[in-house]
Regions:
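Bacterial Sec-dependent N-terminal signal peptides
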Residues: 1-24, 584, 600, 646, ...
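Terminal connector regions
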Residues: 431-468
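Loop and turn regions of beta-sandwich accessory domains that flank beta-strands and are enriched
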Residues: 116, 125-131, 141, 280-285, ...
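Short glycine/proline/serine/threonine-rich loop/turn segments at secondary-structure transition edges
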Residues: 157-164, 314, 431-440, 532-539, ...
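Residue-level detector of functionally pivotal "anchor" positions at catalytic/ligand-binding pockets or at interdomain
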Residues: 351-374, 463, 469-475, 575-598, ...
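Extracellular/secretory-pathway and virion-surface proteins
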Residues: 20-367, 372-377, 388-391, 456-458, ...
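C-terminal outer-membrane/trafficking sorting elements
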Residues: 492-494, 589-598, 602-677
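Intrinsically disordered, low-complexity Pro/Gly/Ser/Thr-rich segments with frequent PxxP/GP/PP motifs
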Residues: 405-435
Length: 677
C-alpha cells in the first residue's frame, strides 16, 4: 500500500505542473473505481498538510460505466470523508472450536479506528440500460464503455478535514453492476471568505419512515451543539432525499413534502423536498422512468444541497438544532418509505473580506458536462456571479471574450446579498480568431459597485475551455408529430435573440419536412415539449398511451445525412449552430441506431429511415399478410442516411409487412394502414 500512496503523491504534482495554474493543486482520490455491488469503496488519500490556505476547494466526481457495463437502475452514491476521531473500538466474535473434550469456545477481538462520515456530495445514477425499448425490449444494451459525466461540488468548508491522510469513501447503494468512479479534488490557493474553525455533524444517515413521531424521535431528533470559541458566524448544510413508494401516500419517492429546520425550538427555515426538472437534466435520454418528478432528486443528477445561515441565532454558548419533515401517513401493507439525510454545521471565524465579488462559473461557452444543455455555444454568454461578503453587490462591469482575442464589455446591475448568486446572460462574444477544437474563454469583473476593485481580486476572473458550435451546411427540418402536437414548438433565434424561424401549429401524427435558409451567423434551435416528455417515450409504449409515441425530430443535411436526431428528450432539445464560413468544422453526420418506419399507424404516407451503411443499394417491399407483394422500391443509395417516403393512400385499410433489405441486412415490421386520422 505504501507504494500506491507514493504514486498518488507524485501524480498530484505532475498534474499541477503540466495542466493547471501554479496556484492550483490537483489530488486524485479514486481512479476507475469499479462500483459493482452494494458496499463502501475506500481509498486513503494524502491531502495538503497544515499551514496552507485555499480560497476554493472543488470535488469532481466523474461517473462512468463499470467494465461490465452500466447498471439499469437509479442508485444513490455518496462521497464521504471518513474522519478518524482518534477513538478505538472492537468487536467480539466467536471462533469455531477445535477441542471437543472438553468443549472450548474461543473468541477474538477485532480492533478498529472509529471513523465519522462527513458527506461531501451525493448523486443518483442514471438508468444506464433500457435505452431504446423499440430496439432492445429486454434491456440488453446501455451506455457504451466511453460514457462519462462529471459532477462538481464546492467543498471549501471542509478544508479543516481535508488535511494529511484521509479516507475518501465512495458509498454505492446499488445491488447490481455497475458504475465507475473517478474522484479528484482541486485546491485553489488563497484566503477563503471566512475561515472554518469547527465542523460538526447534525445527522449522518436517514432511515425508514413509519410515522412522524417515530421518524423524528429515532432518525432526526433535536440536538444541542456547543458553539466553539471565537465563532462569529455559522451555517447549516442539509442533503435530503425521499425513497420508496407506499401505495397509499406515494411517499417517500413520489410525494412532495416540506421539511423544516428548527433553531432553538422554533421553525426558521422551510424547503420543498421536490425536483420538477428531471426532464431537463444533462444526462438524457435514459431508460427507466427518469422524467418523473421526485423527492429532491432526479436520476442522473447530483442531489442539490440546501444551506441556511445560523449567525443570527448564535447567542450564548450553545444552539439547539432540529429537522422535521411534513407528516404523512403510509397505508398499512402498501410498501415502505424512507429518507436519506445528512446535515453538517460549519462554524466560522471573522470574515477575511468586507467586500468580495466573484465570477463563480462560466456556463456557456464551456465543455463542462454539467452545462451540456447550453453547449457547444456560439451565441449568448452565460456566467454566474456571486457576492461573498455582507456588503450588497449592486453593479459591475463584465469583460469577456476569447482568450487572446478582442474583448467585449457589458454592465451588470442588481442587488445581491451575502452569498447570493445571479445567472447573467450576456450578448455574444467576438469570435474572431476562434479555431477548431478546444479554445479558452475568459470573463472578469471590473469596478464592482463602481470601485476600482474589491478586496479579493483572485476570484474576479474565470477561464473555461470550450468548443464553438459546429457549422451546418444547407439543411432541412423533419418533424413527425405524435398525437399531442399542441405540446410542441420549434424556434430558431439569431445571436441577438430574435426569432428568425418558428413553427408550432402542428397536426397530430403528421410529418413535416421544410428547407431552412438562413444568412451567415450564429443560431440556436429550440424544440420544446410542454408536458416535458418529448415526442416518444418507452413508458407510454408499454402502458398503451400511443398518442404520446411515434414522434421524431431530425435535422437533415440537404445533400444527404443527418446532423441531429432526437425523440426522447424530456423538456426540450436545444442546440447551437453556425451558418457561414467561420473557422469551425462542419457538424459530424449521425447515423440512426436502426431502420425506422413511421408514422405507424399510417394514414396515407409512410416514411422509412435507412441508416448509412455504404453497402450498395437498399430495397423496400410491402406485402400483405398472405405474402403477396403490393409495392416495391429499389436502388435506394446507402452511402448516407436517407428517408424514403412512400405513398400508401391507395392501399385498403389493413395490416401490411414492410421489409427493408441492404446487402445481408434486413428489417421487417408490421404497419397498419388506417383511414381514421
Amino acid at each position: 500500500m505504501k507504494n500506491i500512496y507514493v504514486l498518488l503523491f507524485l501524480t498530484v504534482f505532475v498534474l499541477q505542473k503540466d495542466t493547471y495554474a501554479e496556484d492550483t493543486l490537483q489530488i486524485i482520490a479514486h481512479e476507475k473505481t469499479q462500483m459493482v455491488w452494494h458496499r463502501n469503496y475506500d481509498q486513503k488519500v494524502f491531502f495538503p498538510t497544515e499551514g496552507s490556505q485555499y480560497r476554493k476547494i472543488y470535488m469532481y466526481f466523474t461517473l462512468g460505466c463499470a467494465d461490465g457495463g452500466c447498471s439499469g437502475w437509479d442508485y444513490d452514491v455518496l462521497t464521504q470523508l471518513m474522519y478518524n476521531t482518534g477513538a478505538i473500538d472492537s468487536s467480539v466474535s466467536k471462533l469455531d472450536t477445535i477441542s471437543e473434550s472438553p468443549l472450548v469456545v474461543d473468541t477474538t477481538w477485532n480492533v478498529y479506528d472509529v471513523l465519522e462520515p462527513y458527506e461531501l456530495g451525493r448523486l443518483i445514477t442514471p438508468y444506464g440500460t433500457y435505452m431504446d425499448f423499440r430496439k432492445y425490449p429486454n434491456g440488453t444494451q446501455g451506455y457504451d464503455s466511453s460514457w462519462k459525466h462529471t459532477f462538481r461540488y464546492d467543498v471549501t468548508d471542509y478544508a479543516p478535514l481535508l488535511k494529511d491522510s484521509v479516507i475518501i469513501r465512495a458509498k454505492y447503494n446499488g445491488w447490481s453492476d455497475g458504475f465507475s468512479a473517478d474522484i479528484r479534488f482541486e485546491f485553489i490557493e488563497g484566503k477563503p471568505q471566512r475561515p472554518v474553525i469547527a465542523i460538526k455533524n447534525l445527522y449522518t444517515k436517514g432511515g425508514g419512515y413509519q410515522n412522524s413521531t417515530q421518524f423524528e424521535n429515532d432518525i432526526i431528533p433535536a440536538k444541542v451543539m456547543n458553539i466553539p470559541l471565537h465563532t462569529t458566524s455559522a451555517q447549516a448544510k442539509v442533503l435530503i432525499t425521499g425513497h420508496g413508494n407506499n401505495s397509499g401516500s406515494n411517499c417517500g419517492e413520489f410525494c412532495d413534502k416540506d421539511y423544516y429546520f428548527k433553531v432553538n425550538g422554533e421553525p426558521q427555515f422551510l424547503h420543498r423536498m421536490w425536483r420538477q426538472d428531471c426532464g431537463a437534466v444533462p444526462v438524457r435520454p435514459q431508460g427507466g422512468t427518469y422524467l418523473y418528478s421526485r423527492a429532491n432528486w432526479c436520476p442522473g443528477d447530483k442531489v442539490h444541497e440546501q444551506r441556511w445561515e445560523l449567525t443570527p441565532f448564535l447567542q450564548g454558548d450553545s444552539i439547539e438544532l432540529d429537522l422535521d419533515i411534513e407528516a404523512y401517513s403510509n397505508q398499512s401493507g402498501g410498501g415502505g418509505s424512507s429518507h436519506n439525510i445528512s446535515s453538517t454545521v460549519f462554524f466560522y471565524g471573522p470574515d477575511n473580506y468586507n467586500f468580495d465579488a466573484e465570477i463563480n462559473t462560466i456556463m456557456a461557452p464551456s465543455t463542462f458536462s454539467e452545462f451540456i444543455n447550453y453547449n457547444p455555444s456560439c451565441g449568448e454568454v452565460i456566467i454566474v456571479i456571486k457576492n461573498n461578503a455582507h456588503a450588497p453587490l449592486t453593479s459591475s462591469k463584465i469583460v469577456y471574450g476569447l482568450q487572446g482575442g478582442k474583448m467585449r464589455t457589458e454592465t451588470w446591475t442588481g442587488n445581491l446579498g451575502f452569498e447570493e448568486m445571479d445567472t447573467v446572460f450576456l450578448p455574444p462574444a467576438y469570435w474572431d480568431g476562434v479555431s477548431a477544437g478546444t479554445n479558452q474563454f475568459i470573463a472578469r469583473l471590473l469596478t464592482p459597485n463602481k470601485r476600482y476593485q474589491d478586496e479579493n481580486t483572485t476570484n474576479d476572473q474565470f477561464v473555461s475551455k470550450f468548443e464553438l458550435a459546429p457549422r451546418w451546411e444547407p439543411f432541412r427540418i423533419m418533424f413527425s408529430a405524435n398525437g399531442m402536437p399542441q405540446e410542441n414548438a420549434l424556434t430558431i433565434t439569431n445571436e441577438k435573440g430574435e426569432v428568425v424561424w418558428e413553427k408550432s401549429d402542428f397536426e397530430a401524427n403528421k410529418t413535416y419536412i421544410e428547407d431552412v435558409s438562413l444568412p451567415n451567423g450564429c443560431y440556436e434551435l429550440l424544440l420544446t415539449d410542454a408536458n416535458e416528455d418529448g415526442l416518444d417515450w418507452w413508458v407510454y409504449r408499454q402502458t398503451g398511451q400511443t398518442n404520446r409515441t411515434n414522434g421524431a425530430f431530425r435535422i437533415l443535411k440537404q445533400g444527404g445525412g443527418v446532423y441531429a436526431i432526437t425523440s426522447d428528450f424530456g423538456r426540450e432539445f436545444r442546440t447551437n449552430f453556425v451558418v457561414g464560413q467561420m473557422d469551425v468544422p462542419e457538424a459530424p453526420l449521425e447515423a440512426s441506431s436502426d431502420f425506422e418506419i413511421y408514422p405507424n399507424p399510417s394514414f396515407g404516407k409512410l416514411n422509412i429511415l435507412i441508416p448509412g451503411f455504404d453497402e450498395g443499394f437498399a430495397s423496400i417491399e410491402i406485402n400483405d399478410l398472405l405474402g403477396k407483394q403490393i409495392k416495391t422500391i429499389t436502388s435506394i443509395p446507402t452511402d448516407l442516411e436517407h428517408i424514403t417516403a412512400i405513398d400508401i393512400s391507395d392501399l385498403s385499410n389493413n395490416m401490411y409487412i414492410v421489409k427493408v433489405s441492404v446487402g445481408s441486412r434486413s428489417f421487417t415490421q408490421k404497419v397498419l394502414k388506417s383511414g381514421i386520422n
